[in-house]
Amino acid sequence: MASLTKSGVVYDARGLVEPDPEPPMTAQIDGDSAVIDATDLSTRKINLELKRIVYDEGVNNVTILNPGSKHSLGVGILKRCNITFEGSPGWYACGLIDGPEVQINGRVGWSLGENMMSGSVVVEGPSGSLTGAALRGGDLVIKGNVGARTGIDQKGGTIIATGSAGINTGFMMQRGRQIICGDVNDGLGDSMYDGVIYVGGNVASLGVDCVPGEMNDDDVEFINRKFRIYDLGTPPDLKKFECGKVLHNYDALEPSERKLVL
């Protein structure tokens, strides 16, 4: 037996939201564009409607109104298209995407773009912790601060934050690049395998095996290109940090040395 809450969201007998797997068919479609008003829709209904109009209707430009900080919006879209959120999604927005170009005119919660493969997500505000967790490709651009553990387990792609970043940014980073224009809290690049982190402000402390690097012409070209693409103005003076290649090269260490490093 299902129950209806005051907000209009339906729950099944186990308390799991939205047992109905059918899209609501409420989007306003006009040629190659569509608008979804998410005010009275559950997360599942919003995502079902988004996938319907992108895959079944072939719409390439979608605007989602009133996302209401609902979690897990815009996930699993595996097609090139343009998606605009007018308002703020909650946690886990735009995870597991491969191709979309997403514009978020608001702020966003934890784990933005988790396991993103390609495309871009631009946020006109801050983002929470775990931004770009396990990012594999594409660009995440946050016009503001990002929280703790940004780019944890990052495997590719680029994360740009015009503000500051929290603790353990770049933790266990494997590949890819980050550009943090402001300050970074303790543990930058802790246990990173590879990749590069550029920082414009002060670093509270470096994590294990994260060391300063030397900027070169390729770094400058890359940074200038990304700032030009996303109209971010002139880049600040940035410092480069990279992996010292000690922690994870165990074959080159004696057992006693491993204990010291760890």
Residues of each region from the PLM?
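Intrinsically disordered, low-complexity terminal regions
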Residues: M1-N66, S72-L73, I167, Q174-C181, ...
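Beta-strand repeat architectures
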Residues: K51-N61, S72-C81, Y92-P100, S111-S118, ...
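Feature marks extracellular polysaccharide-active and adherence modules
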Residues: L65-P67, G76, T84-S88, G95-L96, ...
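A structural signal for beta-strand register positions
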Residues: S120, D139-V141, T158-I160, R177-I179, ...
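Glycine- and acidic-residue-rich phosphate-binding/metal-coordinating active-site segment common to enzymes
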Residues: A148, Q154-I167
